[in-house]
């Protein structure tokens, strides 16, 4: 279940970083 949480967190970071 931790993998999913990390995956979602990473997704936001990747998207947010690219959006910035």
Curated annotation (Swiss-Prot):
Keyword Secreted belongs to the record: yes
Q: What highest taxon heads this organism's lineage?
A: Eukaryota
Question: Pfam families, per this entry?
Answer: Toxin_3
Matching InterPro entries, A to Z? LCN-type_CS_alpha_beta_dom (IPR044062), Scorpion_toxinL/defensin (IPR002061)
Segments forming domain LCN-type CS-alpha/beta? 2-20
Q: Give one GO molecular function term.
A: sodium channel inhibitor activity
| Biological function | Binds to sodium channels (Nav) and inhibits the inactivation of the activated channels, thereby blocking neuronal transmission.
Family label: Belongs to the long (4 C-C) scorpion toxin superfamily. Sodium channel inhibitor family. Alpha subfamily.
Q: What is this protein called?
A: Neurotoxin BmK 18(2)
């Amino acid at each position: 279940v931790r993998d999913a949480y990390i995956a979602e967190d990473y997704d936001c970071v990747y998207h947010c970083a690219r959006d910035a």
